[in-house]
């Protein structure tokens, strides 16, 4: 029951983002008029890939939070298997053993939500940070995402 809610929420997040992003991208071009310079196709493709990485990480974190909040650990484990590389899964498990907390959230409690924020791209890897919302406070984890394999390859504390 809860996993259907999580899947619907993830699908809704992707659908809304897919509908809004083209409008946001069109705004500056429309404001600049017909003399606007167009980015080369490679730049547009790189931008699209980066947006895909941000969407995927954001979708993962919010679906994972929903699953953990309702103690649906089977769904949480499925999400880990789908969105994390096997090396990242092993690193998360090691972090959990050492810190006695959730290795995805880097916390013992469950936040209210999450927002993935792009930082940079280098050599096929997108570097992001994820802001975890805790009422009026936030905490941050750093995330590495492989554009090649389309999985999270690392989660760490910002230090």
Q: Which stretches of residues belong to each language-model region?
A:
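Surface-exposed, charged secondary-structure patches
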Residues: 28-35, 97-138
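Core segments of small alpha/beta cavity-forming domains
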Residues: 41-98
């Amino acid at each position: 029951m809860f996993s259907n809610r999580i899947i619907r929420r993830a699908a809704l997040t992707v659908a809304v983002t897919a509908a809004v992003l083209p409008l946001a991208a069109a705004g500056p071009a429309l404001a600049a008029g017909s003399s606007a310079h167009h980015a080369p196709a490679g730049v547009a493709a790189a931008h699209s890939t980066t947006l895909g990485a941000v969407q995927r990480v954001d979708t993962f974190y919010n679906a994972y939070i929903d699953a953990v909040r309702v103690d649906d650990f089977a769904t949480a484990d499925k999400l880990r298997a789908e969105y994390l590389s096997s090396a990242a899964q092993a690193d998360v498990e090691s972090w959990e053993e050492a810190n006695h907390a959730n290795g995805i959230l880097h916390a013992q409690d469950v936040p209210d939500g999450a927002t993935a924020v792009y930082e940079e791209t280098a050599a096929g890897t997108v570097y992001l940070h994820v802001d975890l919302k805790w009422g009026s406070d936030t905490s941050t984890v750093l995330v590495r995402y492989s554009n090649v394999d389309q999985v999270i390859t690392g989660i760490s504390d910002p230090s």
